[in-house]
Amino acid sequence: AHMDTLGGMVCSINEKGRLMLSALGGMNPNNAEAENCRVYTRSGKVYSGTFQLKNASIHVNGSYNDTARSYDAMEVVLDEPVESKADTEALGIMTGDIVCFDPRTTVTESGYIKSRFLDDKLSVGILLGFAKYLKESDKKPARKIYQHITVFEEVGHGGSASIPADVAEILAVDMGCVGDGLSCKETQVSICAKDSGGPYHYDVVSALIEAARTAKVDFAVDVYPHYGSDAEAGLRNDKD
């Protein structure tokens, strides 16, 4: 599983002292408009701001509804009295600083966890919970198991390094896709047979299906058209 997440990086400071961003991972600007964010500087200072359209007032911008939300059209407005690039630089903000968006985490009375960026922290929690269960129940797996938590999955190379040499099989535990053309529901285990990089190992997928059936787990098998995993990154780095 992976514990890294999506965000932004300052790629420039414009003449108004506002921040232009470049995506970290697949952070879609459509999903972050008007979101509160934090800017982490190299000096350790943290500044708050809002990620919004450059011409953000619908009362002023006649093209507001028609403007594509892209990183070129959007900016971070700092919660500081800055009016120029020099003002912002004086705060210690510079190109390369990390920008984190508010996850807006909520746990409902009915037990639902709602938040941005649950991908893939929930899976990390599940694996740690499984390890705790094995220890407390004094159960020993029939095979040697590593829990490998990566921190570069969202940028594509998380599973390509630091995999122990004696590993014979890699199972990537990640979010499950739900959407048009897929059969999985939010309450099921999702088994990915193929993603944008091609099919996964036939025998491994078959074994996962059989394990789910044996355990009487509700599951679905799907193809993810726009996805890649740490297991795929491992394969691309000769972890066959």
Tell where the protein language model's regions lie, with residue ranges.
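N-terminal hydrophobic/helix-forming segments and targeting peptides
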Residues: 1-240
